[in-house]
Amino acid sequence: MADPVIPVVLFAYARPAHLARALACLRENGVPLIYAFADGAKGAADAVAVAETRALLRAVDWCEVRLTERTENWGLGKNVLAGVTAVAAEHEAFVVWEDDLIAVPGTYAWVGAALRHYAADERVMSVSAWTHPRVT
C-alpha cells in the first residue's frame, strides 16, 4: 500500500454529544486526517443540533479535517455512499467511522496495521472490528 496516511471517513448528523465522544476517541488514537460528511437537517427541529455538530467538526485543531456539509438531508445511505466513493477516489485505504462509535486507544493503529498487512492479499476485501455489547 503506497498511501502512508490512512484517513478516517466520519459521518455525522444531529448528535453533537455522540460526535464529541467520537472525536475525543479519534484524537486519543492519533488520527492524522478526517474526511467528515455532515448531513443536512431533516427539518427545523434538527437545525440546531446539526449546527452544533458542524461547529464541533470545524473546531477540530489537532488534525486535518476536510469537511463536507450537506445543504439538504441526504439520509445515511446516500451520504455514506457518496462519502466513501469520494474518499476511495483519493486513497487506497480508509477507516469508516460513524458519530456514535468510540474505541479504545490503539484501535486506529490496529486497523491501519491490518489494512497494510492485507493490502496485497486479494482474498481480503476489508477489515472490521466488533465487540459484544456491554451490559451494565
Question: Residue spans of the language-model regions?
Answer:
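Active-site nucleotide-sugar/metal-binding loop of Leloir-type enzymes
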Residues: 81-93
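Short acidic/polar active-site loop segments enriched in Thr and Asp
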Residues: 32, 92, 125
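N-proximal low-complexity "stem/linker" segments adjacent to membrane-targeting elements
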Residues: 1-28
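A short, glycine-/small-residue-rich helix N-cap motif at loop->alpha-helix starts
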Residues: 71-79
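Short beta-strand-to-loop acidic/aromatic patch adjacent to the donor-nucleotide binding site
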Residues: 91-102
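Structural beta-sheet core signal
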Residues: 8-10, 36, 96, 126
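Conserved donor NDP-sugar-binding/catalytic core segment of glycosyltransferases
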Residues: 106-136
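Acidic donor-binding segment of Leloir-type glycosyltransferases
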Residues: 25-68
